[in-house]
Regions:
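Conserved ABC ATPase "signature" region
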Residues: 11, 15, 22-40
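ABC ATPase "signature
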Residues: 127-128
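Conserved H-loop
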Residues: 96-104
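Conserved ABC ATPase signature
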Residues: 3, 44-48
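A short, proline-enriched helix->beta-strand linker immediately N-terminal to the Walker B motif
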Residues: 63-67
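Catalytic Walker B motif of ABC-type/P-loop ATPase nucleotide-binding domains
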Residues: 69-72
Length: 153
């Protein structure tokens, strides 16, 4: 909620999901620490930069302990430094939770993904690791593999 502080947003979401008072406090502290939100914990969400807002959004999603996290264009519109910081946060989650990430940035798909799926107009055209997609298309770069899959498959 834009008029709540970072801390209040985290507490609110944890409360909605039925965590008791102590668990709300514990989970809030965990998310503040995990996403380095301590320096902005008393700032209203609407005053945060795009990068901080994305980190808060992910923390709010994770406070509920989901099995799957959907990230739709998580770094769209972020500057290079904010994007790299968010990449580090996402990287740190690998192996702890299943993530499905949509992106138009090939370098993001390359650096963050264990498997990559290429969709065209809602149709799944190819799925595989980076190496598998490059081998499938006979290309050296993901961008070239993507273009070949989109244009020829």
């Amino acid at each position: 909620a834009p008029n709540l502080t970072v801390r209040e947003n985290l507490e609110f979401i944890a409360g909605i999901y039925g965590f008791g008072k102590e668990k709300v406090k514990q989970k809030t502290e965990e998310m503040l620490e995990q996403f380095h939100l301590g320096e902005v914990e008393n700032s209203k969400a609407k005053t945060l930069s795009g990068g901080w807002q994305r980190k808060l959004s992910i923390a709010m999603a994770l406070i509920t302990e989901p099995k799957i996290l959907f990230l739709d264009e998580p770094t769209l519109g972020l500057d290079v430094l904010a994007r790299r910081e968010l990449w580090r946060e996402i990287e740190a989650l690998k192996g702890k939770i299943t993530m499905i990430l949509t992106t138009h940035y090939m370098e993001e798909a390359e650096s963050l993904s264990d498997e990559i799926a290429v969709m065209v107009k809602g149709e799944l055209k190819a799925v595989g690791t980076l190496d598998e997609l490059k081998k499938l298309t006979g290309t050296e770069k993901l961008e070239d593999a993507f273009v070949k899959i989109v244009e020829e498959m």
